[in-house]
């Protein structure tokens, strides 16, 4: 097969690229650095992420995806072009077929924008798959079966809860609250409680290192550095896992609210399947310590984190593009 088939999980925080027959080939932050004067793309991915919050006046580093959908069309197109060129080389004779996953709750206009950006970036054919379906395929759930499966995919920009049966989404709810909002909650908490201004990267590091959805029996602590909001001078403080838990709790409750909303609307026959099988959690944010325990407590349904949760969506997208005939019911083509 001369033309490559590529699956892309274009996330708000990270973008992952899967090539049919090769597996995962790229995992880079969804960040693009743009020159403010001429609008040219300066850097993409890891290189641009290092520039977040540190750029000189003539460059801005921004995230082209907001809440799981395209916020800046031109920059998203440049990002897709960068991924396609990295996989196929700068000059390619055979245009690749590209599949992108999108949140199930996006509008037709937003879907069209993703398809157009993909074709403009150099794809021969563009396909879309709903994120919960891709996550379910990647988590190896039997999506074509006549029994219900429930998955909640919690990424950087949005959390998607869905019940899947017979290869389609039966009920879904999407909240534009996820990993990024956890970081924002930590930033807001530090400012309010300690008068300390910190950046996105610092907040994310605290969330990953000492964050927990439930209060830990043995609290952990770490040093956080930032700028004092009163004196304006650099300052470091010691923060504990208990503080991080307190800061992120409202966001976690909003995510769990989406799961509850789906359970309330699920047909009784499928609800009984879900009670037996439980809810599968995927996406980077589901790896937060004790999040599955908190969700089990609040929904009353056993929750399990999928194996390798960060990879579920991109693996599912890759499997779907490798087996287009098998999943044609679940895909939109352009």
What residue spans do the PLM features occupy?
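Nucleotide/phosphate-binding catalytic cleft detector across ATP-hydrolyzing
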Residues: 1-154, 162-280, 286-334
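Acidic, divalent-metal-coordinating active-site segment for phosphoryl/phosphodiester hydrolysis
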Residues: 159
